[in-house]
Amino acid sequence: VNCALDANVAKVRKDFTVEAAFQVAGGTACGLFGVSGAGKSTILSCIAGTEQPDRGYVRLGELTLFPPAFPVYLRPIGYLTQDPYLFPHLNVAQNICFGIAEHNGAADKIWINELRDRLQLDSIWRAPSYAISGGQARRVALARMLARKPNLVLLDEPFTGLDRHLVRELLDALGHWHKTLGFTMLVVDHESEVLERLCPQTIAIEAGRIVQQAAWSELRANPATPLLAQLLAPL
């Protein structure tokens, strides 16, 4: 399903009001880039439904996500953050398959097996989730997010704290499924390298406002603000 994202949200915070209006073409990937505390995660939370905007709207294709017309858990959205949020009382397989047991057909089994094999989860498939490593938990969380084949994927710095080898593995897997499944993707990360790998287009955020939306080549060649130029400068 090719679902374009159309978001226009405002959320009042103590330090400033986050106001962002943008569109992401269906099946494409877009980044949100800026310093910590700029409002990137707030925007993502408003789209995911974990926070309610104070005003505005969020649309995904023909669906109106805000104002809410149906429960958050029914939204065709995958949302991945720094914390895997695995269910500690379930094993790895149960975590990944949570919520799709009622669709236990042959196609679902093939898809779950693909996730298991690509993310190298076979050796921990029946392990309790509390007994696996942090890197393994990130793999499980990615598999669980993709298990239901969401139309929109939201990533809020899910690779923070991981070694570069694992980050490359997860980026390769995510890029592969983005191409094959065709979901729309919005990615928050403080590492420009991660965003460049996943997202041809990026939105730069400063103090809750969009200051530039462009391809990475344009952002690097002509940053719109001094702060953005600093963030994009080599170390």
Regions found by a protein language model. Give the residues of each.
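Conserved ABC ATPase signature
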Residues: 128-132, 136
